[in-house]
């Protein structure tokens, strides 16, 4: 109803991940993230660390005519970047540029960004250049200029997504 009424409501959801499984399969919401993204006039944020969480909270407060959802994990996650420019405002950004010629781009959201960073490190140790893109908000990323989106996700590079959920939607 808050989406239909264009209300500024901020929903804070926790336990967003299968990373902590001791609560059992009823607490592993693998389909929920994509389902929430599909609701019209709702912005879903899935931050990867405390910096992104603070940025996404600020963006949610600024959403005057629609509800926002912050999907947070219960896992202890590392801080992946320091402050500075509010990178989450673009929906996605290059968290880690390739150290060698870029061969792969890993796009990840939320707690899986840490997995992407660890994977990139392993691949780069084998000589493969890997960018890591953190995407806290799909909807914001899709509103960016074509040039920005093409710079982050060029056509001529292998792209891999990591999100603990359904693969629906990632094909785009």
Kindly give the residue locations of the regions a language model identified:
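Two-metal-ion acidic nuclease core segments, chiefly of the RNase H-like superfamily
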Residues: 34-35, 160
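Thiamine diphosphate
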Residues: 9-13, 19-29, 53, 62-172
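A glycine-rich helix N-cap at a beta->alpha junction
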Residues: 3-16, 35-38
């Amino acid at each position: 109803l808050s989406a239909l009424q264009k209300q500024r409501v901020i929903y804070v959801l926790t336990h967003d991940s299968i990373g902590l499984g001791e609560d059992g399969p009823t607490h592993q919401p693998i389909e929920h993230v994509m389902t929430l993204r599909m609701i019209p006039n709702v912005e879903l944020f899935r931050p990867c660390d405390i910096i992104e969480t603070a940025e996404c909270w600020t963006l949610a407060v600024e959403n005057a005519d629609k509800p926002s959802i912050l999907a947070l994990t219960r896992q202890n996650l590392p801080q992946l970047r320091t402050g500075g420019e509010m990178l989450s405002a673009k929906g996605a950004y290059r968290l880690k540029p390739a150290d060698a010629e870029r061969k792969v781009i890993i796009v990840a959201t939320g707690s899986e960004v840490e997995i992407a960073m660890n994977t990139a490190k392993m691949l780069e140790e084998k000589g493969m250049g890997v960018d890591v893109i953190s995407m806290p908000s799909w909807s914001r990323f899709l509103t960016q200029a074509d040039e920005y989106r093409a710079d982050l996700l060029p056509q001529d590079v292998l792209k891999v997504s990591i999100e603990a959920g359904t693969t629906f939607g990632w094909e785009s």
